[in-house]
Amino acid sequence: MAPSADPGMSRMLPFLLLLWFLPITEGSQRAEPMFTAVTNSVLPPDYDSNPTQLNYGVAVTDVDHDGDFEIVVAGYNGPNLVLKYDRAQKRLVNIAVDERSSPYYALRDRQGNAIGVTACDIDGDGREEIYFLNTNNAFSGVATYTDKLFKFRNNRWEDILSDEVNVARGVASLFAGRSVACVDRKGSGRYSIYIANYAYGNVGPDALIEMDPEASDLSRGILALRDVAAEAGVSKYTGGRGVSVGPILSSSASDIFCDNENGPNFLFHNRGDGTFVDAAASAGVDDPHQHGRGVALADFNRDGKVDIVYGNWNGPHRLYLQMSTHGKVRFRDIASPKFSMPSPVRTVITADFDNDQELEIFFNNIAYRSSSANRLFRVIRREHGDPLIEELNPGDALEPEGRGTGGVVTDFDGDGMLDLILSHGESMAQPLSVFRGNQGFNNNWLRVVPRTRFGAFARGAKVVLYTKKSGAHLRIIDGGSGYLCEMEPVAHFGLGKDEASSVEVTWPDGKMVSRNVASGEMNSVLEILYPRDEDTLQDPAPLECGQGFSQQENGHCMDTNECIQFPFVCPRDKPVCVNTYGSYRCRTNKKCSRGYEPNEDGTACVGTLGQSPGPRPTTPTAAAATAAAAAAAGAATAAPVLVDGDLNLGSVVKESCEPSC
């Protein structure tokens, strides 16, 4: 006689089955916290270095030109800060002190309501200038105080926008704006500064400020500036918000992506001559009904193409993978329901915080009307499929009551682990907060710092690291991202237990350098100099390109096309070979009806004449989350909504708020 079934076990079976399927439907939040707060030991709140004030954008550059990075903070109702890591004290210390004799005194700019900040070399002297976007007494349109562009001159930092030559030219912006970013639009090594203004009707178009070489005399310290936005094709009227720069559509030239408010996004494709054409609509990233905030660029699925991630204010967040269909570039949103869940987002940061090879995405939210915790996701690459998006535990960086306004990543203490610095403000004065990672201490890493022909940081350059086992990893040297911010000018690679084989840098002018990475160079910082003409005449040295790649005649690593190799790599039951970046896949010879063709992996038929496949089947859990996200987004658009503290009602009179909200 068979034993009777345990009734308790029978009741538990449905619950166990539910637990079994939950991780499959959506990446579950891991219990291990990613970050630990170290503010009290590294940057304790005080009057001089971490005042309780309204802060906004944050940038990373070498302010004192000693080879180490400083963290520059835009202070809105207080001074701007320049934080330097003191290795003896193991603390961040503000070097922009309130002493007129200090070479950094002018950077404080106590009168300015600074909101955005960026740094780059605009005159080719090898040292980065620092631009602060001020938005005094204005949410949009005309402000009452100009922006500042600081240059190290006469042994101190001075504002060159207030120079007589530039005052006469009327270059200094009096328009309210948000983000600023640096773009080497012609590949000259001299940068222009893109200013995302917040237009009011036909007042306050976006600007593009750069040095006028014909009117400048650098030997006498005269640096004449001009606005070339109209000439370059980027003079647009919009509610400018986030900006990010890099070779998005171009192979090397710097393109510009802007996520906007109350209007479509811009994707300015560099024509190769420093002029741009907006390709956002044709590429599928215009998102005209949402209100963009933080944005970042990365290659999330490691296919060698630059992808875009950004957050929408109380709207669905986007994770766009770049695709190529019949030779046309399109972006496809792969955001999961949890990832896309609307929130009052400000900063979006992409980095490998635990050095495990996979990129994380950090959403810095502002506690708006109620608590709003920050969120963290890992994007896990999958062979021949979309990445898996897994929600993580931010640990101390959760900050449910934080009024998040900005943030950056940098390794200020040189331990190979990225540190996270967050700024707060707008509706409540709060000090900065600093976090260190808790995971991945034993993982390998490599940091690459390319230089321009003048020796400055090569912002906008593309860095590809070829590895022994995990293929190619791509990074863009940041020229502005996050929202109001600019990350460190470093390509930081976490490698897990893998090792680098070679590295390749492509500058905005198309020049390239490839070199092997010795095993002894792991877990270090590599500086890559701009190539000299004589370097290109030498025979290329043999490169170790790693699995899936091989050295070509031009001396650089390229994807190996396994599909043309002999013997044939695919089995008989899957005879169609599809070459992919660093790999290949085999699929069946699927037959499709007229007007359709097999998709890339041969698992389905897709339309060739504009037909769209039906919606993907979703599990009950994913469907519920999708419905919840749609409901939240609908609620956000069905009634008057506050957009950064301002009613989004068009011409209707707006509620009072901080002008820079």
UniProtKB/Swiss-Prot annotation:
Pfam families: EGF_CA, FG-GAP_3, UnbV_ASPIC. Induction: Up-regulated by BMP4 (at protein level). Up-regulated in mesenchymal stem cells undergoing chondrogenic differentiation and by BMP4. Keywords: Disulfide bond, EGF-like domain, Extracellular matrix, Glycoprotein, Repeat, Secreted, Signal. Disulfide bonds join C563-C577, C570-C586, C592-C605. Gene3D superfamilies: Integrin alpha, N-terminal, Laminin. FG-GAP repeats lie at residues 46-88, 105-147, 283-333, 395-437. Glycans are attached at T608, T618, T619, T621, T626. The keyword Secreted applies. One of its GO terms (cellular component) is glutamatergic synapse. SMART domains: EGF_CA. Expressed in the interterritorial matrix of articular deep zone cartilage (at protein level). Isoform 1 and isoform 2 are expressed in brain. Isoform 1 is detected in lung and chondrocytes. Detected in cartilage, bone, cultured chondrocytes and lung, and at low levels in heart. Not detected in osteoblasts. It comes from the Eukaryota. InterPro entries: Crtac1, EGF-like_Ca-bd_dom, EGF_Ca-bd_CS, FG-GAP, Integrin_alpha_N, NOTCH1_EGF-like, UnbV_ASPIC. PROSITE patterns: EGF_CA. It is found in: Secreted, Extracellular space, Extracellular matrix. GO terms for biological process: axonal fasciculation; olfactory bulb development; regulation of synapse assembly. Residues 559-605 form the EGF-like domain. GO terms for molecular function: calcium ion binding. Residues 1-27 form the signal peptide. O-glycosylated. This is Cartilage acidic protein 1. It comes from Homo sapiens (Human).
